[in-house]
Regions:
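Short beta-strand to alpha-helix junction loop
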Residues: 47-54, 94-114, 123, 253
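Glycine-rich FAD pyrophosphate-binding loop
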Residues: 11-37
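Central helical "cap/lid" subdomain
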Residues: 145-209, 272
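A short alpha-helix-loop-beta-strand transition element characteristic
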Residues: 41, 56-78, 190, 205-211, ...
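Generic structural signal for small/hydrophobic residues in well-ordered secondary structure
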Residues: 27, 61, 113, 158, ...
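Conserved flavin/dinucleotide-binding core of flavoenzymes
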Residues: 4-5, 13, 85-94, 138, ...
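Glycine-rich active-site loop/strand segments that organize a redox cofactor
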Residues: 28-57, 72-76, 80-83, 87-90
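A conserved short coil-to-beta-strand element within the FAD-binding core of flavoproteins
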Residues: 124-140
Length: 384
């Protein structure tokens, strides 16, 4: 979502913006599937916000008219042992600080940002292939769209991609220093190697049995599970993080993994859980706009924030807005917000606008000349 937010801020400052998106949708790692009535989207990417820790995200949600509700946790929690024996914990699994979810699904956030791009040209299915410093100091952006190669020229470019994709999917001319390129290739993309299974049901039947919908398992294939229903429980669902590493998932038939997950849901929540109305398996390691082969290795720890410093010939021409470049909460929604705001602030300072970066709910009346165009490419952005 960092590319969308950056484009929104730039448009409000009066910049001409072209947003290039490699996918056929916006949002990057923010992705959900719609309920039948379209009133809710079930998250297959990031789902949680922690207001005490994510103040900028909360500010933007408020500005965009989006509300939060607390993750359902009332009722007993379940623990599945390696033997597949299930133990019930009456007190459940309290989350501190409480995890909150966006009413309607996290994709409502990216939908709202997209809807506010009035003058920005948005090109979907447009994959940036290369960046060139032009003799006049502008940046040439080579892209591929519909099997055709194209190019545009921008005064500055904001890149809303994780470090690994910047290093492995883009041609840079002049080339990046080998040390920087290697450092980016070694930087894990948060949650890129993970997979998430979502099962939809007519009702949240587990609640009637006194269960919270939360479980942890040492048997698998799902390692951690939660209630994924909407705030009212009218759109019922369970989701689980797949505990099988990406390399192991590649050796499994997709349907075999789904079948094993449904059997596990039956062990945990009863026979009704085995036959959902619909089931979705989102394997982020298979998304080339998110993951590289290096992301198949499980993360040993949360990635540290990445430096945004660039060599002199790219400095002030390229600005990095991927969530992994955020000073705090890299990889999360909050990181995406912070990285986008910082990148736009740096670009604004570079181009000499006297306008102050507008925060949530603020506007600016001054505008740069239309000739000052800024390209913002987002092929993958967002949170964990």
């Amino acid at each position: 979502m960092s590319g969308l937010l950056a484009a929104h801020l730039l448009e409000r400052l009066g910049f001409g913006v072209t947003l290039l998106e490699a996918r056929e949708r916006v949002g990057g790692r923010v992705f959900g599937v719609a309920a039948e009535d379209g009133a809710h989207r079930f998250d297959l990417g990031p789902a949680w916000v922690w207001p005490e820790l994510n103040p900028r995200t909360v500010d933007w949600l408020s500005t965009l008219g989006l509300a939060l509700f607390e993750q359902q946790g009332r009722g007993a929690g379940l623990v599945e042992l390696p033997s597949q024996a299930v133990r019930r914990h009456a007190t459940g699994f309290a989350q501190q600080p409480p995890s909150m979810r966006i009413v309607g699904g996290t994709a409502r956030l990216t939908d709202a940002l997209r809807a506010r791009l009035v003058r920005t040209r948005v090109l979907l299915g447009t994959r940036v292939r290369g960046l060139d410093v032009c003799p006049d100091g502008t940046v040439g952006v080579e892209f591929e769209r519909g099997g055709q190669v194209g190019a545009l020229v921008a005064s500055s470019v904001i890149l809303a991609l994780p470090p690994r994709l910047l290093a492995s999917t883009l041609r840079w001319s002049p080339a990046l220093p080998a040390e920087l390129s290697q450092r980016w290739r070694e930087a894990p993309t948060w949650m890129a190697g993970h997979a998430k299974l979502l099962a939809l049901y007519p009702t949240p039947f587990w609640r009637a049995a006194g269960l919270s919908g939360s479980a942890v398992s040492q048997a698998g294939p799902l390692a951690e599970l939660h209630d994924a229903s909407d705030a009212e429980g009218r759109h019922a669902a369970l989701f689980g993080f797949v505990g099988v590493p990406a390399a192991g998932r590649r050796r499994l038939e997709r349907q075999a993994l789904i079948d094993a997950s449904l059997a596990q849901l039956g062990r945990l929540f009863g026979a009704e859980a085995v036959t959902p109305q619909a089931v979705y398996l989102q394997d982020w390691a298979e998304e080339v706009e998110t993951a590289t082969p290096a992301d198949a290795a499980p993360n040993s720890a949360h990635p540290a924030p990445m430096s945004t410093d660039l060599p002199a010939h790219w400095r002030d021409r390229i600005h990095l807005a991927g969530s992994e470049f955020a000073p705090d909460f890299p990889g999360y929604l909050e990181g995406a917000v912070l990285a986008a705001e910082r990148a736009v602030d740096a670009l604004q300072s570079q181009l000499g606008s006297g306008n102050k970066l507008p925060g949530p709910g603020q506007t600016t009346e001054a505008a740069l000349p239309a000739a000052s165009r800024t390209g913002s490419h987002t092929g993958e952005n967002g949170g964990a």
